Swiss-Prot record:
Keyword vocabulary terms for this entry: ATP-binding, Cytoplasm, Nucleotide-binding, RNA-binding, Thiamine biosynthesis, Transferase, tRNA-binding
Domain THUMP span(s) in chain numbering: 61-166
Enzymatic reactions: [ThiI sulfur-carrier protein]-S-sulfanyl-L-cysteine + a uridine in tRNA + 2 reduced [2Fe-2S]-[ferredoxin] + ATP + H(+) = [ThiI sulfur-carrier protein]-L-cysteine + a 4-thiouridine in tRNA + 2 oxidized [2Fe-2S]-[ferredoxin] + AMP + diphosphate; [ThiS sulfur-carrier protein]-C-terminal Gly-Gly-AMP + S-sulfanyl-L-cysteinyl-[cysteine desulfurase] + AH2 = [ThiS sulfur-carrier protein]-C-terminal-Gly-aminoethanethioate + L-cysteinyl-[cysteine desulfurase] + A + AMP + 2 H(+)
TM ranges: none
Enzyme Commission code: 2.8.1.4
Gene: thiI
Molecular function in Gene Ontology: ATP binding; CCA tRNA nucleotidyltransferase activity; tRNA binding; tRNA-uracil-4 sulfurtransferase activity
Lineage top rank: taxon: Bacteria
SUPFAM superfamilies: Adenine nucleotide alpha hydrolases-like (SSF52402), THUMP domain-like (SSF143437)
The protein, known as: Probable tRNA sulfurtransferase
Pathway this chain belongs to: Cofactor biosynthesis; thiamine diphosphate biosynthesis
UniProt-listed InterPro entries: Rossmann-like_a/b/a_fold (IPR014729), ThiI_AANH (IPR020536), ThiI_fer (IPR054173), ThiI_N (IPR049961), THUMP_dom (IPR004114), THUMP_ThiI (IPR049962), tRNA_STrfase (IPR003720), tRNA_sulfurtransferase_ThiI (IPR050102)
Amino acid sequence: MMTYEYILVRYGEMTTKGKNRSKFVSTLKDNVKFKLKKFPNIKIDATHDRMYIQLNGEDHEAVSERLKDVFGIHKFNLAMKVPSELEDIKKGALAAFLQVKGDVKTFKITVHRSYKHFPMRTMELLPEIGGHILENTEDITVDVHNPDVNVRVEIRSGYSYIMCDERMGAGGLPVGVGGKVMVLLSGGIDSPVAAYLTMKRGVSVEAVHFHSPPFTSERAKQKVIDLAQELTKYCKRVTLHLVPFTEVQKTINKEIPSSYSMTVMRRMMMRITERIAEERNALAITTGESLGQVASQTLDSMHTINEVTNYPVIRPLITMDKLEIIKIAEEIGTYDISIRPYEDCCTVFTPASPATKPKREKANRFEAKYDFTTLIDEAVANKETVVLQTVEVVAEEEKFEELF
């Protein structure tokens, strides 16, 4: 019985790139190789327009499950490779059609002749291939407008690809082509989604989390580590910086009027994150803010908070409502972790009536009454850094270390 031997990957948005497309293709190939490390027999050939993954006996379903999380892939097809002879093409098309799962009642044939010297024209091939499928199946009909299955045939010199099973990729651009940002990872629903969407634009992420023991627990800290771990499904690794924030928050609570404590806290977070970004050669800061969702996410608040950093602040969720954000969180696997009932530092010393239209002048005046410089320096110096990778990579490295 014929089985799938190849996976053909289509790039999507990458095809709009010009002279630097080779960089995008090379990065995508590198990311795919990393993602498929546990499949040693696979061979990958990345061309200007498409990527060919030769399975060499590896499980196509297991490989497909990994590919769907790689940014830069628009779609991919499971494919069979047959000689460019009519009878071989007909047999291959039938074999591919019979492997399609689900309730299939209709199909159509699509033929692309890259090899123009093939002795039959496209309009001659369609009834030959389609007729062979009809002769060898029951209760199946042709529907050229809305078929259950599209049997794609690509004819080349010497060989042809047969494809039925088309699957969606993650879209976007390959992680690593767009520089690096620092993501403020709070432990809530929003910030992991912001990190995911930032990676989708080809940007590598490192995460900064502020924790305030004993007001926040070790379980809250572990929750954020688990979120960062979940995000490694979409990249090679996530570096997480855990910043001790207790003294900063206690001082804010003591020195700053309660209505401005939330605003000043966010400004301190920005200052500390900018310092870490400088150390780590990041080019921007990403947050999970959604316009108007809470008091610190009004336009006035963002305007006042932004004052303290020269870095671009990326807000991927800015126009989304909560239900849209939750939907993405559920799809990417972070929602169930985010709703664990452990407090983060943003809920510590929460003011009863935070200012929704804070002014820069007032924030600067309140901050001028106390020198926060030393506290900021200590927070940066005492951060804990954890590098997280996919579970399979960690297991592979541990297995390697056991050999020595």
